Structure formats: C-alpha cells, structure tokens
Amino acid sequence: MATKSKLEYIWLDGFEPTQSLRSKTMIRSDFKGSLDECPMWSFDGSSTLQAEGGDSDCLLKPVFICQDPDRINGYLVMCEVLNADGSPHATNGRATIEEDDDDFWFGYEQEYFLWDPETNLPLGFPRDQTPQGQFYCSVGGKNTFGRDVIEAHLDMCLDAGLNVEGINAEVAVGQWEYQIFAKGAKEAGDQIWVSRYLAERNAEKYGLAIEWHPKPLGPTDWNGSGMHVNFSDGRMRDEGGEKLMSQICEAFGKNIKKHIDVYGAHNEQRLTGLHETQSIHEFSYGVTDRGASIRIPIGTIEDGWKGRLEDRRPSSNGDPYKIGAVVISTTKSSY
C-alpha cells in the first residue's frame, strides 16, 4: 500500500493592514519530501480578500518545505500567492525581494504575547497592576506565564528543522521572544512565517492565541513587541570599519519612510521614544543603544567594527520578506 503524506500548504491572505496566515492540506502518495514534488495548487481568493467572486482562483507556488512536527508523515509547505496568469499577486511580499543570495545574513528577534481569549489580556496579566520589570528572562510562578506553551513551540520549530537560536521571556508579562537566523532574505522570511504558523497552531492546543500587534495594551507603561532585524553582508563581515558601518546607518537615516512603510502596521504606537525605542519620526544610531533606531552591538565593535547591525524598528507583525528586501536595498545603496 502506498504511503500517504499530509502536505500543509501555507500562504498569506489579503487582509489589511496586517496579513494573516492561511493553510489547507493536500494528501500525496509516495511523497519523498522534496520541494520539487510539491505541485502548484489553487484556492478561493474571494474568501481571503485576494480576488473577486467572479474570477476567484489564485495560485499557490511552493517555495519552502520542512517536516510537520505535529503530524505523522506531515510536511509544511510555505507558498507564494500568484495570480491566475502566474504573475506575483499584489499581496506577495516575497516577490518584492529583487536581490537575494546567501551573502546577506538575517537574524530576526520575534517578540509576541501569549493572549488569553477569555480575559482579552496577556496570559498572567496582573490584577493588581504590578509594573513591568520582574518578567524579563524570569523564572517562577509569579513572573513567568506559559512556559509549557513556549517550550512546546520551541520543540516544534527544532523538529521542523527551523534554525531557532534561542528563546526568552520578555519585558512585559506574558510576552516572549525567539530568534531565528538564516542566510538570504527569502530563507529567513520563510522560516519566520513557518515559525509563526507553528506558534499559532501550538497555541490552539492550550486555548490561547498569539498576539502579534506591536502595542496590544495601548498607551500604557508596558513594552510593545518588535521584530528587531540583525543583518550583515560579506562586506560588513570581512571589511567592516567604523566608517563603513556609519555610512550604512546614514543611508538608513535618509530612508525613514521607505523602511517604516514596510516595518509593520500600528508601529507608531510602539515607536514612541519610550520603552527601548526611538520615535518613529526620528532616526539615530549608537553603540549598544537600545533607544536608537539602529543599535551597533558591542560584539561588532570588539571584532574590529566587523559584523552585524541591528535595526530595532520593525514591529512584531512586520512581514520579514518586505523587511529583508528593504534592508538589502538600502544597504547596497550606501556603497
């Protein structure tokens, strides 16, 4: 009897201002696990705000595959959305990456809240309004909430083969972070989106939701959620130098709107100049400065001004494809 495999096709819908993840399952016989074996598929774009009802077919082009850690004989297949004629759909952020190779390295720091649908607040949110401060990298039942959920997600990501480099509890209650490193903007974006999908699916089991909004608690004295992007190319890693790094930072400062436009919706609520952020209207960079737009890590300095920079402005709900594309574009324009 032929072995049956479950292929979960994942894509981004047309909702604005922040796209959501969608998925559906295809069953294949004698599937060996390669991307080349994954056929194009279609879906009803009129149900995802990506087409009109009278001409509703959109195409799914597989671009990334990994093991599905939650299913027997399962695979996760990240897809680009195409129009019926095969051209990139307007909602296809991956297609905005014009130049992509392994020379550009990306490390994303994905923050988010574990959200309790019953209270409509972060998991463990204090009734007595305990101020933040005790929750960052914390331990213990008074400080840390949802560790079992987080550990399960970490295991799922590792079992899927995603390059997660670490996790930690964040500054606000119920807020967590994981880090993913990959070479190439498309590969990094693929891994972030699949990891987000796994976070959502894992949370279902616990009756929880994942809140990607950058400031879900509004204008309160609680940190928002970002997705800091650490980046470098061969020139930054091999040549480096204070002049080169400053030159790149200055180029980012000349393109504030270009970056903010793709760094995530509602980011103005987070980038206020408070809570370890620079104002969305300003630009600054500095060594180890977590209140700057771009932080120059101490490790970069110690390595002779060689290595990575960290743009702290992207929000937790930002599209890593679009973020990677603009980081590459601006960095290259500085040379």
Task: Please annotate each region the language model reported.
Residues 1-335:
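Glycine-rich, acidic/polar active-site loops that bind/position phosphate-bearing ligands
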